[in-house]
Amino acid sequence: MEFKYNGKVESIELNKYSKTLTQDPTQPATQAMYYGIGFKDEDFKKAQVGIVSMDWDGNPCNMHLGTLGSKIKNSVNQTDGLIGLQFHTIGVSDGIANGKLGMRYSLVSREVIADSIETNAGAEYYDAIVAVPGCDKNMPGSIIGMARLNRPSIMVYGGTIEHGEYKGEKLNIVSAFEALGQKITGNISDEDYHGVICNAIPGQGACGGMYTANTLAAAIETLGMSLPYSSSNPAVSQEKEDECDEIGLAIKNLLEKDIKPSDIMTKEAFENAITIVMVLGGSTNAVLHIIAMANAIGVEITQDDFQRISDVTPVLGDFKPSGKYMVEDLHKIGGVPAVLKYLLKEGKLHGDCLTVTGKTLAENVKTALDLDFESQDIMRPLENPIKATGHLQILYGNLAEGGSVAKISGKEGEFFKGTARVFDGEQHFIDGIESGRLHAGDVAVIRNIGPVGGPGMPEMLKPTSALIGAGLGKSCALITDGRFSGGTHGFVVGHIVPEAVEGGLIGLVEDDDIIEIDAVNNSISLKVADDEIARRRANYQKPAPKATRGVLAKFAKLTRPASEGCVTDL
């Protein structure tokens, strides 16, 4: 790939940060340490590139990131004037943690990742950063950390997984989650239940639908912080290896031209990122994370920006969880660049935004494949959308005075009025499914699991999957002050602000109350008289904190509400 920059170029030192340590004669101990890690005399004048991966053995999304990081380090070291230094940070496997209390740590991990990238690179004076994330919170954590440092940076996505297969049926991670509901209702045999579990995940790569990881990877490529095709190159592919091999030249180009995240991550670039999320039918988590990423670079993005763009942006991608296809299928028809090329042609994107290639978004995709709407139905044209407007809707009302996020594909309708069934937490809901407490026409209310109440705002993938598997996905709605996985589908509303423990009305809902959700007029309301609400509020007792020490307690104390991205550094 060719890298360039159209702006004014001035001669700069590539090692302008690391020279603080490598060139200062009053730092002999520092320089002795460098010799200790194998530096040669000529290495002290080189720009240091920190290569951070979220590699660990315990997650298919991340198990190969160390290998990718090593390839990137080799690419950097083969590039004149650069030296690569690998480091690592943590991750949480959402697929493993979902459904249990460990899921409270997932969103927290985004902040830990950002903090550790900032901490390591800030202390070590790296001149540039390359991040290699895999699972959901890895991506925004990486971008937030790089934005805070504001040094030349590139994100290399670990890549999507291939589909699994059992008895001729294609599987993915959500197949395993939904099998639980089928098991509870007796709609799957023990043998097939085990067969789905054994075959849903065939190996390396992030969960394969348009779930949170793939959504954010596509958004970040569109934002301009990844090389073209990064988000749709499969984890196990020659294309992903080739991408790693290009990073040395790419990061040197950014260093030479002093192109920083603040030059790339503009208001218009974030609008592009939101647009691709809508077009691809992406995860509700994109709302939370794009707001947080923008905050880190000093750009104001709010929930209302999502609604504004949703109002004029159709859903064109037929991807799981609500559609048919996986991201590996998108790769076969030209990947995200082919989609961007089409959207630019139709005037849906800002084409003049700068990217990590040193070129604009429009220049990056000029040679991408053209989408052929005759030979494939993975992506539809604007005149034949899956949904005429965006699937992510921001709802307000007495149940969500600070807003909430609904994921409405259109298949489940756009209006729901039903009877509340209240659950204080995820396990309470699962118990309710198993006991037959939920029926058609009910609105499940899962509360006290917000950023503070959770703490950590865990995802409700297990409940929504159980609802689908039990055959109630089209006849029940679910609302929560928690989050949803990118794998969630159905009539669902999350991110309710204020959350229950912060005085939100969701904390006062009782069984048999009437709840109305209107995705046409963007409202969510509890149909209970004001005097009755006042009586309940007077008698309300706030639950005791679930965490009083450690990282969960710190998060609960520092976090902003979901409407502000749950950031912790304001």
UniProtKB/Swiss-Prot annotation:
It holds the Pfam family ILV_EDD_C. Binds 1 [2Fe-2S] cluster per subunit. This cluster acts as a Lewis acid cofactor. Keywords: 2Fe-2S, Amino-acid biosynthesis, Branched-chain amino acid biosynthesis, Iron, Iron-sulfur, Lyase, Magnesium, Metal-binding. It catalyses: (2R)-2,3-dihydroxy-3-methylbutanoate = 3-methyl-2-oxobutanoate + H2O; (2R,3R)-2,3-dihydroxy-3-methylpentanoate = (S)-3-methyl-2-oxopentanoate + H2O. Mg(2+) binds at D94, D136, K137, E459. The modification N6-carboxylysine is found at K137. InterPro entries: DHAD_IlvD/Edd, Dihydro-acid_dehy_C, DihydroxyA_deHydtase, DiOHA_6PGluconate_deHydtase_CS, ILV_EDD_C, ILV_EDD_N, IlvD/EDD_N. Its cofactor is [2Fe-2S] cluster; Mg(2+). [2Fe-2S] cluster binds at C61, C135, C207. Its EC number is 4.2.1.9. GO terms for biological process: isoleucine biosynthetic process; L-valine biosynthetic process. Pathway: Amino-acid biosynthesis; L-isoleucine biosynthesis; L-isoleucine from 2-oxobutanoate: step 3/4; Amino-acid biosynthesis; L-valine biosynthesis; L-valine from pyruvate: step 3/4. The active site is at S485 (proton acceptor). It is an enzyme of class 4 (lyase). GO terms for molecular function: 2 iron, 2 sulfur cluster binding; dihydroxy-acid dehydratase activity; magnesium ion binding. It comes from the Bacteria. The keyword Iron applies. Homodimer. Functions in the biosynthesis of branched-chain amino acids. Catalyzes the dehydration of (2R,3R)-2,3-dihydroxy-3-methylpentanoate (2,3-dihydroxy-3-methylvalerate) into 2-oxo-3-methylpentanoate (2-oxo-3-methylvalerate) and of (2R)-2,3-dihydroxy-3-methylbutanoate (2,3-dihydroxyisovalerate) into 2-oxo-3-methylbutanoate (2-oxoisovalerate), the penultimate precursor to L-isoleucine and L-valine, respectively. This is Dihydroxy-acid dehydratase. It comes from Lactococcus lactis subsp. cremoris (strain MG1363). The lineage of its organism: Bacteria, Bacillati, Bacillota, Bacilli, Lactobacillales.
